[in-house]
Amino acid sequence: MYSVAFKMLVGDRAKYFGIIMGLTFAALLITQQSSIFIGLMTRTFGFITDTSQPDIWVMDPKVQFVDDIKPLQDTELLRVRGVDGIEWAMPLYKGLIRARLENGNFQQCNVVGIDDATMIGGPPEMVEGSLSDLRRADGVIVDEVGARTRLARMPRDQAGNPIPGAAPVPLKIGDALELNDKRAVVVGICRVGRTFQSQPVIYTTYTRATTFAPRERKLLSFILVKAKPGQDIGELSRRIEVNTGLRAMEKWDFSVKTYQYFMKYTGIPINFGIAVALGFLVGTAIAGQTFYNFTLDNLRHFGALKAMGASNMRLLGMILFQALIVGLIGYGLGVGLASCFGLLAGRTELSFRLLWQTLAVTGGAITFICMLSATISLVKVMRLEPAIVFKG
């Protein structure tokens, strides 16, 4: 009977491909938009992910997310270091500073100042140079994307004049730029995770970063804390908060707090939610209507099977089998196309992160569409009179 159901399904090629196209479109749009949304929201706490050494981030109690900088006094670092259970506590500067390029243009940059001695808080991966090169005079490390795009230099001829229409030359080791009217020399190129902000990322020492920054009474952005071996991190966080009055959060908790801020105060979830819902509704409409029309066109065949003694349960199994076939094909094609899209977008600025949970949600959505389509068709078949096969 299942072979008969399969032959009925593929017999009408137009409706067969129509059902598959509807399910493929739904699976593609749900998977693609969900993966872009997840990738975009992951970027909101990308800086926390890149800074992997500390267990705890200490900050002003009013900080809402990682880029909401509310500076502390430098004396707070000593207070935190005095708390029992801490292996080390290091300062971190993070702020936007204007860079003056070779052509006279200005570019806002994310400047990160890390501990001068230990270099804790540095970039996750060095492409050129060494992290210790930051100890050189005026040394900075630039992320590779910023070096080849927004901080790139215009090529010049032998007379020193810019060459019109020529491709920009990526910033390289030895090149100089100005940060807040102070000289900085590139001593390394690093690779960092993409963040929600699009500005180039520049690493330097904490002391040098505070000289680049505009003069303020408070310049300490965060305190990075590592717990002693065997120390409960949650308990240490509470101890820091009690002793200092500051907010102390584990890495994951700080990431979640940042993620929740963007979920609550931006329109990103609504925009992507509408796109996913649209894909689901369009897929349901196309697949459901086409599958129902397919069933109507085959009522005489179902009636003949019923006249030959096929039970309603057997007919139900045939319809569910047909729904399973088109569901698996549509799901596979949709997810496959979304995965190819993700591979092509991997080296672009587009965020795309495909998780197994996304595949599960897409599978559940396609299953629901197939079951709904099969149920609508099943009602017609269950009410079918075998005598219809003998009419006109």
Summary of predicted features, one role per range:
Residues 1-31, 41, 46-47, 320, ...:
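N-terminal Sec/SRP start-transfer signal
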Residues 16-20, 336, 356-364:
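Hydrophobic alpha-helical transmembrane segments
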Residues 24, 28-110, 128-131, 136, ...:
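Hydrophobic, regular-secondary-structure patches
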Residues 36, 44, 190-193, 236-285, ...:
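Peri-transmembrane interface segments
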Residues 110-165:
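Short beta-strand boundary microenvironments
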Residues 124, 151-249:
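Basic-flanked hydrophobic alpha-helices used for secretion and membrane insertion
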Residues 279, 300-346, 361, 365, ...:
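Transmembrane alpha-helical interface segments in multi-pass membrane proteins
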Residues 358-392:
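C-terminal membrane-exit region of the final transmembrane helix in multipass inner-membrane proteins
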